[in-house]
From Swiss-Prot:
It comes from the Bacteria. HAMAP family: UPF0235. InterPro entries: DUF167, YggU-like_sf. It comes from Shewanella frigidimarina (strain NCIMB 400). Pfam families: DUF167. One of its GO terms (cellular component) is cytoplasm. This is UPF0235 protein Sfri_2863. Belongs to the UPF0235 family.
Length: 104
């Protein structure tokens, strides 16, 4: 298994992320690997969907896309999520460093 399989650059230009979210962190950041997922720490609390909305906003800003282009495919109620970012204008350096050279 490819050790960076948690991030896939889709053929249509979308980015699919397998993410572990840490809500109520001291600061927002892409932490790195967490098992076979990308760990992202966010300051928002996991109450009433605030963490999901904040995560979408954070990733949209990082990838320079509209919030409507960030979709939580799986994991709305948990910390383990699949997120699709449609046509990212920028891939954050923390994510680009983990991308497999075969998926670009």
């Amino acid at each position: 298994m490819n050790p960076v399989s948690y991030i896939n650059d889709e053929q249509q230009g979308d980015l699919l992320l397998f993410v572990y979210v840490q809500p109520k962190a001291s600061r927002d950041q892409i932490v790195g690997l967490y098992g076979n997922e990308l760990k992202i720490a966010i300051t928002a609390p996991p109450i009433d969907g605030k963490a999901n909305a904040y995560l979408s906003k954070y990733l949209a800003k990082a990838c320079k896309v509209a919030k409507s282009q960030v979709h939580i495919i799986k994991g709305e109620q948990g910390r383990h999520k699949q997120i699709r970012i449609s046509q990212p204008q920028v891939i954050p350096p923390e994510i680009a460093a983990l991308l497999s050279p075969f998926s670009l």
